[in-house]
């Protein structure tokens, strides 16, 4: 079904000449996504190569291969309209790539794993994302000046290294694309194009994105107790008022909302989203709401039971370089510096990280909030080639002691089963308490907004029942420091990820763990965990050869990255 046909069906629904039920019977999610996201006009040509799309949307941008170029674009003094749009690409990455991903228009990588570190971050940011692009990355030390031109013709010069990607076709012909080249990326087809293409805007995407921006602008006024009531007072709303009113009152959006509300009425789903910043939960709230715009202005009718935070991902919140350095100091520990200096970093963590949590909670968490322990391999914060000597000098640490701790902690070979999640907190109970108090204080400050909504803590990499018991014990201590009783606190309980063989073997004992009032209330299993714990395959290696080969030989009916193999997990 073409985009025009889908739009026509929505028009008929808006006019009352067709039903949402009939619409849902005629289309599939892939077809529906064609009207939800921006799409290239017509049939594009000039294809360089193709990978596997994992997040939809079609965009134009300048190819950026280095963090220095991305940071130069993000920190320029031009306004948003005059900031160059760029497509970011790396073969892999770590937490230092997060800022580049947050401000890019799309991301692609040669890595074939859906769980590749930067690809996951890109999907969480809502960026068109493609994995398994068959290109090779190149870099030379020679200096090069890149001229970045905006849509309004303003030029920004960036000094950087010489970088490019290359693609070799089946006939042996190789095409190279240098950093700074204008390209287009399709998150629908997975194709990279060697020219910038015309894009048809989606009114649905425009409405949700613009209203999210309105909320974020209103929320910057920390004196405003409920920013949702102030959307129409923002500059973003003022600039977009006429276009917003037309889009919201369009038959396409009216029909889409009727379809959405019909789906909600017959299945009563909750929109539970991955969250690492306020925009995530703000957009989830908007999607679950009924939005109208009449002579009295914009109206958003929300039901908190229809959306919530399914997974609050602490590890994905670390974007700012200064904040990342704070966490690095804490990971290296109090033995690397003076007590006074270490306490300074603890205070900075509490203030800055707590402020991030407070802004998320103040948005309104909806029906539920599941907060997960810091689930980040150490190698993504402290890679093997990290300049530990320079870092120690910069932040007032003892270089020799810092290097000794660094050498002991780093060089993890199996990073995803390394020292992260509950393992780090068991080794460093001081960090566990610091994290819990930071999250709980932020949630306490938002109790007026969230009412009776409960928070559940989710433990990553848990293997031993004792780990669950110790976490619960520390949690109860923190709760009694902040509330009169544990019963009066907003904590529903504790759950565990099932991502280690030990967790599967000991699941009954783990789920039996409890404290005075807090107990284990459930578990969560996902694709990554299935691959590593059930199949005992490295989750980065598995998609390249082993799993495709098992599917080809009919050992598995489908890839576990698209369905669960019940013969293994029951």
Task: Please place each PLM-identified region on the residue numbering.
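Short, well-ordered loop/turn and helix-capping segments at boundaries between secondary-structure elements
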Residues: 15, 29, 124, 332, ...
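Conserved catalytic alpha/beta cores of large enzymes that bind or transform nucleotide phosphates
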Residues: 1-29, 37, 185, 218, ...
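Predominant activation on well-ordered alpha-helical scaffold segments within soluble catalytic domains
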Residues: 6-10, 21, 105, 116-123, ...
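Cysteine-dependent phosphatase catalytic core of the protein tyrosine phosphatase
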Residues: 1-75, 174, 191, 529
């Amino acid at each position: 079904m073409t985009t025009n046909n889908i739009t026509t069906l929505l028009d008929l629904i808006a006019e009352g000449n067709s039903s949402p039920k009939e619409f849902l019977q005629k289309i599939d999610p892939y077809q529906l996504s064609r009207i939800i996201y921006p799409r290239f006009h017509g049939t594009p040509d000039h294809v360089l190569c193709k990978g596997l799309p994992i997040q939809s949307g079609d965009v134009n941008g300048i190819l950026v291969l280095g963090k220095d170029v991305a940071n130069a674009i993000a920190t320029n003094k031009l306004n948003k309209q005059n900031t160059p749009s760029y497509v970011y690409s790396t073969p892999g990455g770590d937490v230092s790539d997060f800022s580049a991903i947050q401000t890019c228009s799309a991301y692609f990588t040669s890595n074939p794993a859906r769980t590749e570190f930067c690809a996951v971050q890109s999907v969480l940011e809502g960026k068109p994302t493609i994995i398994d692009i068959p290109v090779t990355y190149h870099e030379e030390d020679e200096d090069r000046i890149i001229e970045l031109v905006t849509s309004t013709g303003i030029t920004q010069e960036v000094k950087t290294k010489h970088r490019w990607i290359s693609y070799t076709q089946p006939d042996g012909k190789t095409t190279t694309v240098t950093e700074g080249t204008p390209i287009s990326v399709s998150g629908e087809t997975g194709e990279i194009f060697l020219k910038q293409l015309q894009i048809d805007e989606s009114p649905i995407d425009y409405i949700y994105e613009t209203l999210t921006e309105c909320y974020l602008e209103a929320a910057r006024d920390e004196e405003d107790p409920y920013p949702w009531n102030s959307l129409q007072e923002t500059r973003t709303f003022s600039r977009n008022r006429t276009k917003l009113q037309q889009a919201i009152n369009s038959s396409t959006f009216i029909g889409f909302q009727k379809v959405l509300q019909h789906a909600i009425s017959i299945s009563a789903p909750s929109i539970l989203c991955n969250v690492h910043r306020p925009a995530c939960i703000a957009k989830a709230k908007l999607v679950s709401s009924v939005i109208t715009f009449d002579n009295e202005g914009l109206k958003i009718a929300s039901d908190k039971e229809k959306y919530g935070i399914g997974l609050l991902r602490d590890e994905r919140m670390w974007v700012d370089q200064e904040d990342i350095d704070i966490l690095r100091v804490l990971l290296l520990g109090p033995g690397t510096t003076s007590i006074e200096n270490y306490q300074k970093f603890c205070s900075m963590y509490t203030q800055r990280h707590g402020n991030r949590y407070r802004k998320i909670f103040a948005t309104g968490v909806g029906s539920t909030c599941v907060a997960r322990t810091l689930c980040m391999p150490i190698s993504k914060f402290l890679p093997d080639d990290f300049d530990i000597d320079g870092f120690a000098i910069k932040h007032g640490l003892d270089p020799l002691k810092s290097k000794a701790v660094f050498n002991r902690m780093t060089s993890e070979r199996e990073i995803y089963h390394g020292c992260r999640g509950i393992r780090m907190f068991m080794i460093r109970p001081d960090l566990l308490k610091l994290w819990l108090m930071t999250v709980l204080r932020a949630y306490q400050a938002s109790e007026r907004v969230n009412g009776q909504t409960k928070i559940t803590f989710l433990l990553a990499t848990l293997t031993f029942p004792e780990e669950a018991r110790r976490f619960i014990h520390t949690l109860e201590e923190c709760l009694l420091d902040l509330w009169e009783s544990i019963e009066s606190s907003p904590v529903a309980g504790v759950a565990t990820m099932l991502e280690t063989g030990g967790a599967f073997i000991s699941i009954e004992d783990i789920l039996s763990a409890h404290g005075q009032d807090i107990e284990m209330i459930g578990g969560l299993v996902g694709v990554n965990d299935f691959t590593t714990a059930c199949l005992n395959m490295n989750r980065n290696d598995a998609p390249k050869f082993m799993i495709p080969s098992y599917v080809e030989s009919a050992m598995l009916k489908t890839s576990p990255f698209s369905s669960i193999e019940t013969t293994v997990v029951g």
